[in-house]
Structure formats: structure tokens, C-alpha cells
């Protein structure tokens, strides 16, 4: 494989034995594709906005004389870009304009004669747009819409598994779930009658539904039963014989024909008997007359003369009835065929409990159940039933629902109507009865073929449709009012309901979540998350174990490892690396096709439904050079996901990759295969909580997934087109695009502006740092600048730390960690956190609040960091309690005495009627002010500071645009120069001439002249574009801000806090090995090796065996080897050894082991080898892909190559005494993360503060500035010690003795340290509670 210039800077050695068949797909596809389908630049009418409009329009008035038709829609351009929306706190959205046509028909002329047509563009609110990285900016914050895993529409057959009824009888049920509309359930009761429920209301006999569908009793029986025909011949009774029906029954009489006895009475009828009957062609058999008793008539028998019904359908036949029928001249009687085994009489029994007798009574019954208390009329009852399942407006199975419905019932076609038909309902009942009769299986609801993904686009479309339906009602009313001559479509449509529905969904839906922006991995994982919760989904409380459990169909679709711990376990999942959704919303995963035991390059995506039919081999099955299986038997997954051994020719597909099973986060854990699943779960979850460190450090031991995640997360800057770096500084990169990638007639310059020190959602710091140098070539899609937690385009969440597994004076008891002071000094885990504090000046009833430096009763020192406008300077170092923005609020006028009024009038003292409400730094916080923004309402005069900021922004914007213009001009003029030199004008002449004049030259060649004219036009275009951009930018900066009602001004102050690591901070590895720092130890006290090199962190060896996460030990060994090789390269570089020797050593390292990666350093120039060596000095990065990683021999080989002991253990010496430790210790390099659980955020202290209203006890928690709870057990502890006075203090003055604590405070202030405890408030509360129960208690002094 050839490496590009950028890739050659640092190559990660890959231990993977299998070459990558399929590259990791773009990780945010699920979000971006879904939203693209919703917005659809060229609508197809099947989905998205277009489908929503078409489903609601045209809206016809009640009398049919006018209709409002939909023509097309257009999304405008958003006013502000993403960055501006974040700063201003607005939503990144585009206006939606819809072209509508109002058509009036002539009432007097023939139907359909058009009288008038009005067409108009109507504004229908704003649609939030998705950013390039799959997020939405709503009110200035980035949010993610999580995809939902919900039950697919269709029909499901299930059973209660014998849990409902005390007898343990299994009751079966069927449920038809539409995409929207009423649910229809059928269920058996313990007596085997079949009932129906609509929308989970009370049950009705299922035959009521059939009667409402206009079936008669005879037709119903005909649908569900086979018939038995009895013939009356004189006093004999013959039965038509179908031998197969007799199988398994016991003969109650001799079965004989033509004198031959086939089965004697009392014998069980077997297959041998049936064969004999069939062979002799026995068609009829004589039965005793009693045999017909209890059989059920299949149709009505009427007296042909009188017309009287002798025997109605579904009536049990008795001897009297038989005699009557014979008398009436009937020679053949049809009865229902039922038996106890596999043809139950369920429908027949249900008809007996059915109160209705015809269609109307059935409809009335349904109406009464759906609308209790309303008097039913025929029209209302019919309308209700029709609307329930047969109306396009009210009921929609959707394409998915119809496909699942037809597949479940074995109908060939996958398409059909969105509403139910008579046949559909009958087919569901038939299948349910078949299952009850023992034919057919119930469905597995947790199978991923029965659960589908609803992504952003689909959910937004549903919300939009809800808004449209609300509008439709209003428009219908308006159309029916008449007098439409002067009305335009704009007058009819009120866009508020639509924008309200959309806003509600994006702003406050359970699935619209505040983006987890801790680091690039947490962003990617959040966008790939799949939740079973949310509207139309499950709730935590109701979800059982089955739903949460790993299902065989999760393989390759949903990660079995990554899911939260706690109440949401198993309900929130993560998409596997290669998974995607198909058109129906079911998850698919890719497989390589296998033909006759040979694995092909062809890749097919299979959904869980299709996968069940095939046998699929694992990705680690052994193949020869012709891609044939080498083993006689191959481990593979058969039907139902069960694993087994199969012959190669039986196999249909093979997995694409070993990491296909797991999610992105789990695929980042090296040696995942050696970790216990519970710990791997913690490891995957904790990587998302890693805080980006000051300097990112790539992991020495990775898995090869680091690059795709960093690129796809969008935090790094990636080249849109290939070219050469023309200019680079901390905030901008300019690329001169390659000739073959430029569009004719453009300057061929790409400018990338970098994000500097911005706040993320989690208050971590987002900063981009260029990683290219001037003049370097870059290819398309290559990395230009690293974002937070990325290092040369690879994800770098933590730091490579030298660790030792050994106990050290109890400082690593219970997972604590002992950290060397050097880690703190080198700022390895120092992080920057940025806080946004805002101050809002509102209009109050007593007057406007004012932002000012003139604050009453505040000393000069407190105002030292404020400017004249009362706003803190950028760069000021502030600590808890400092004023950031001075603000005063008008106080209510107190009643003044006449004397005070006189003094006020004379001296005009106004200062006393305002109170200080300034924005101060929260307690316990300190930092540096890095930015201040002032937003002023339109029409309110801007203060000096706001004008300064505005001027600065204008200057910066102009400077940026001018620089951009200069760069583009330079690119353009270099082309002009080349053209003119080609055209015969000397370079000297050009150098003396002004550049603008170059464009006025005339060239002899006509083609060159036209090219020059083209370039001149381009130059004009550039200037115009520059003017336009500058004007737009200027107007955006100058215009007032759209603030909330009643808000005059908002000031936002950004504080940056640098946090070093300290005892109490939480750290973790990638294998679920988490712990808290117990002590920061001086370097000289840390254990050191023979070379005098101390370790940086000491971990407890007891944390490994019981947790079974051995991956961390292997990582430590491999990390040591990686570092060892880096050391060897470093020595060679320092000694300035021969480049060939260096090349040979590095080549040896890359060639070691049986990996599929090929790195040929002979194709590298000496300069490239040196640059590679320079980047490998600190250690050679290694990749050990999950389930396909380095084995023991490779680790040992690498350790040997690095000149290290192959045991991975080293003799250590005690830093304090210099004594050798008793035995060798495992030492190596582990990738450690600092998690976002910092002791600074948790630490909290209180002396006095707020109290709860009823109990008068201090509140709890840091956010409420609460106290420490002294609970029941703590009271026992003090009782056990007999510390009576301490206990009294705890229960009274320190808690809820109101008077006592006030006196105590006064005493402390006065310097007399004694307390006077009184009655605790909670005692009064309990007294009141007892009185509220009607028991009076009086307290008498003893």
C-alpha cells in the first residue's frame, strides 16, 4: 500500500492478520442521510417534507367549492452561520416557503369547472438545519437527535407464556400495530373464546368485528372451519370420510366398510389404519346415530314449506333436531369438523358469547365501547368503525408495516394498501387460530427484524405532519365560512402551529439531547446512539430483562458491550462499526459472499430478517491464498443465531471484519478479547468521559480505529481538495489547490479558519492546532489541523504513562493510584476548562436594571477589574466572589418620613433606591477572563464597551476578508503573470508595471487573450464578492440583537480555568480499570529501575485478577516494547548513525510478526525516513485490532527488538531507601485517561446557607449550597460513643433549631462561644402531622 506524504509522517504498526476487506464507513451517515431524506433537495414524494405536504394537501372545503392545493416548497438560506448562531444564542435554521394554489370552483357550472385560481408563496416557519457534523444548533447550544429503536409496524403473534391465568394455561394473542392509527388486538381467554380489543380498551368477542365487516354467521363458520357431511339413509347414518382427519383419535365405534373392519372400537387410529382406508378408497362409513349428537350445524336449515328455521347455523345437533331435519326432507347435513387436538371449536364458541346478531348491532356494540355514554346513531357507528381501520387519513400501516404484515401472513407481495382490508383481518384471525391449534410459531419481539430504527428525518417529518394537521383544521373552518373572493393563501395559513410543533420537537423532545461534547469520541458515540426510550418507545420502569438483553440478531448491528450502567442498561445501545439502516429502517450488517467454499470480494448487506436463512462464518476463519476455508469444519452461525460446526460448502456468507460485532468505542480498546465483558463495558463508557489534555498524546498501543474516529468526528480540519500549503499560522491555513482539482475560472485557493479556545457543551476547551508546515503537499481528505484530543489526525484521549503494578504503603488500596510529581510538573494531565457566565439586564416593574461600575456599598478594590461600563477586562485574573459585571436593580420605594423626604429633596440622593445585583464569580472558582460579549436589544443605546467590541470585531472581520482577498488575488495574478509571460511579455516589464495594469494588456494569440479577459472578469468578481461579504459581515455585527422579551442587555463573560491533576481526581485506563488519585508523591520517592528511571503511576496488582481485565497487562507489556523501540531509534538519532542502519532497524520493527500490513521503507526518501524516525522517538505506535491482535510471541519479539526483558518485568528499587524490591515488577506503558469527575467540581463546604421551607433543615447538594447530611447511622455512631453534647449540637443548632442557630451565630460573632439549644423544627412538624390525624398533643413542662 502506498502512503501519502502526510501518512508517512507517522505509520502505526498493525498486528492485524487479516487485511481490511471493507473500509470503516463514514461514522455519521445515520444522522446525515436521514436528515437529507427529510429536507430532500429534489423531492420524490415518498418521504420527507414533500410526503408530509402531499399527505395533508389538497385541503377541500366542506361544501367542495374551494380547495387549497400544494405545489412545491423551497428552503431559503439561513441568516447566520453555525458559529454566529452559537455566539448569539439563536437557532441555526432556514425559512420554509411553500407555493400554494387556492382554487375556487363554479357552483352553477358543471362539476370541476374552475372559477378562479390564486397562487402564492406562503411562509411556513423555520426548519432547523443539521450542521456538517450531524448536530443541530438550537438556541445557541449544540444538540443531537438520538435515533429510536421502536417496535416495527405490522402484525405480531405472541403468548403470555402461561403467566396471566392461575392454571398456567398459555394464552395466545395477535396485535396489528399501524404506523399511525388504532391498534387492533385479538386474544384468547382461558375458556378458549377469541376476543378483540381496539386501542387496548375493554374486550369484545372477536366475531363482533367480523359481523361489523358484514359477515353472516354462515360465512364466518365457512371461513374458519372444514365441514363433515352426514347422510341420512332410512334409519342409518353415514359420514363422508376424510381418513387424514382421523389420525391420533380413538375410535368410539367400529370403523367398517363392505363388511371389513378397519379399526375396532376403542383402538387408537394410526397411520397404518389411514393407509388401509385410503388404499381401499373408503369414502363413506356408517356411524351410530349418537355420534352426531353435539356436532354443530354449519349452516341454516329451513323448512322448505313454512320457511321456518329448523336449525340455525352454529346450533348443536340433538336427536330431536335430526328427526325434524329428516322429516323436512334433508338427506345430507353439514356439520363443523372439530377435534381436541388440532381443530378447536374456538370461533363457534365465540359466536355463542357474541351479543350481536347483525352488522348494525355489532357496530353499535363497538361504538358503545369506544364512546361510552354517547347515544349511538347508525351513521355515527358506521363512521366511527370506518375511520378506525379503513380511512387513509386516520390509519396508515406504512410501507414497512405492510411489508411486515404480508411477510408474517405469508403473502407474496411486499407492497399493498396502507389501510386494512376485510381479508387482512380474517387472515390474522386464521393465523392466530392456527397457532392455538399448534401450527406455527409466535414471534420474538426482541428480534431486530421486529424492531426498527426511527432517525432524525423521520421523527422531524412526523412532527411536521402533526403541525400541518393542526393547520388543516383551521384552514377547513376558514374555507367553509364563505366570502373567499379577497382571500389569498397567505391569509388562510397560520404558520404558528407548524413552527411550534417543530420547535417543541427540536427543543424539548426526550430524544433531542444536549450533545455530549467531552471529546471527539463522545460526540461520535452520541450521534450513533440508539435509544429504546422516548415517545412511542419503552419506559425504564416497564422494560423487563428480555428487552434489555443481548439478542443473537444484535450481531454486527448493535454493540453487545457499550450500554450505560444503571437503570438504562440495555435500553440505550450503540450502533456497531459497520451497521447501517436500510430503506425500511431495519439495521443491516455487511457480509462477504461465499460460493462453493470460496470467499469472494462481493459484499452484501443483510438485515436480521434475511440473515436467519443463511449460515455465516466468522471473520477469523482460516483461509488459504485462494480465499478457500482450510479447515474441514468451520465455526459458523446457523439459523436462530446458534453457533455450530459446518462444512465449507455449506457456508453462504462470512463476516467482513473482526470488529464488526462491536461499537466504535469498544473497537478502541486494545486486547478487548482478553477483557471481561463487564469491565469492557466500563472501559467503553469511560473513554467518553476523558477530558482533552493540554497536549494530546497518541496512544502507543491502539487498535487502528483512532484515525477514522478523529476524521469523522469533525473536530479536526480536513483538506477538501489536494494541494500545497501556501500559508499557515495559529488561526488560518491556506492551501493552493492542485491544478487538476480546480474548477475552471476560480482562484484555486482554499482557506481554512481554525477554531481557537472555544467552550464546549461540557465546559472543556475546543482548540485547533495546525499540524502541517509551509510548502508541504496535502491530499484530499488529509489532516491539516488537530482538534481537541487529536494528535496528527489520530484520536488521543489520554497520555502514555509509565506504570508499575505493585503495592506502595497502602496508597493504592481499593483502586487508588499513586502518582509521581513529575506527571504534574510536565502538565501531562493538565486540562483547560472554559465557563460561560452571563448577566442579564431586564426591565422590571420599578424600572430598568442598569449595567454600570457605579455600585452602592462596594469598595474601590472590588471594582478594580471593571472598566467604566462596569464590565471586567479581558485578561483579568479573577477568583470566587469577584465582580465580573456590575449591575444595579431598582428597589421598591420605602415609605419615607417627611424629614427624610426633605433631605432627599435638598441633597438629591438617589443611590439608596437601587440594590447591587452584580454578576460575581461563583465560590470556589478562579480563572482568567478570556472573552467578553455584549448583546444589546435593538433600539437600546450601546455602551462604550459594546462599541469597542463591535469596532474590534469589524476590524478583525475586515482584516480576515482583506487577507483572504490578497491570497486569492495573489493566486489569480500568478496565473495572469504566467499567461502574459507565455504571451510574450517579459518578466522585467511586468515587474515595473502595476498589477492592475496586467489585466489591460493585449496578447497576439486569440485564445490567450480570451483567457486573460476571463481572468479579468474573475478579478472583478473577486472585488465585488469582497465588497458584498464585507457589507454582510458589517450589517451582522452592527445590527441589534434579538433578545428575550423584557431583556435590555446581556453580557457573557468567558472564564478559562487551568486544572492540574490532584488527589481526588478520577483516572482510568481503557479496560474499565478506574481509580482515584490518593497521593502525589515526590519523584525521588517513586520506585525506580536500574537506569534510575522512576515510574510515573503505581497501580494495585490486586485490581487485575478478580476483575479479569487482563487486556491492561498485555497493553502494558506492548507499551513497554513500543517505548523500547522508540528509545533505540532515539539513541540512533542522537548518535547520528548511518541512515541505512536506521532504515533497516525501523523496517525490522515493521516486519516483525505475522500481520497483513506491508511497509516498505525502501520506497521512502532519506528525508522521509528521518521525519518518520523523529516521530517514532517517543515510542512506535502500534495497532492491535480487536479479536485480531498481537499474540504472545509477537509481544516477546517486539520486547526483544527493543532490548527489553521478554518477561515484561523489571527489578525496581525503593525511592526512599534505595533497597531492591523483593521480586521483579510488571512495568510498562499504559494509556491513562483523566475523567471529567474532577475533585474541584465535587468539593464543597458550607457554614450557613439556605434552609428547606418546611423542616428548616439545610438543603443538600453542591448546587443548592447545601449541608452534609448527618443520617440515622451517624447518630448511632455518636450514641455508641456516648458523645451526648456533640449529638445535641448536631440535632439542634447545626440543623433545624431556628432560634438556637441564630443565637449561636450571634454568640460566635460576639466572641462568647456557648450554645443554647431549643426545640428542633422537625419536632414541631411531627407534632403538626399527628394533630392532622386528629390526635391532639399538648406539651406540659415537667
Curated annotation (Swiss-Prot):
CC per GO annotation: DNA-directed RNA polymerase complex
Catalytic activity: RNA(n) + a ribonucleoside 5'-triphosphate = RNA(n+1) + diphosphate
InterPro entries: DNA-dir_RNA_pol_bsu_external_1 (IPR019462), DNA-dir_RNA_pol_su2 (IPR015712), DNA-dir_RNAP_su2_dom (IPR007120), DNA-dir_RNAP_su2_hyb_sf (IPR037033), RNA_pol_bsu_bac (IPR010243), RNA_pol_bsu_CS (IPR007121), RNA_pol_bsu_protrusion (IPR007644), RNA_pol_Rpb2_2 (IPR007642)
Family annotation (Gene3D superfamilies): 2.40.50.100, 2.40.50.150, 3.90.1100.10, DNA-directed RNA polymerase, subunit 2, domain 6, RNA polymerase alpha subunit dimerisation domain, RNA polymerase Rpb2, domain 2
CDD domains: RNA_pol_B_RPB2
EC code: 2.7.7.6
SUPFAM superfamilies: beta and beta-prime subunits of DNA dependent RNA-polymerase
GO molecular function: DNA binding; DNA-directed RNA polymerase activity; ribonucleoside binding
A Pfam family reported for this protein in Swiss-Prot or TrEMBL: RNA_pol_Rpb2_7
Keyword entries, A-Z: DNA-directed RNA polymerase, Nucleotidyltransferase, Transcription, Transferase
Signal peptide residue numbers: none
Any single biological process term in GO: DNA-templated transcription
Function of the molecule: DNA-dependent RNA polymerase catalyzes the transcription of DNA into RNA using the four ribonucleoside triphosphates as substrates.
Protein family per UniProt: Belongs to the RNA polymerase beta chain family.
SUBUNIT field: The RNAP catalytic core consists of 2 alpha, 1 beta, 1 beta' and 1 omega subunit. When a sigma factor is associated with the core the holoenzyme is formed, which can initiate transcription.
Protein name according to UniProt: DNA-directed RNA polymerase subunit beta
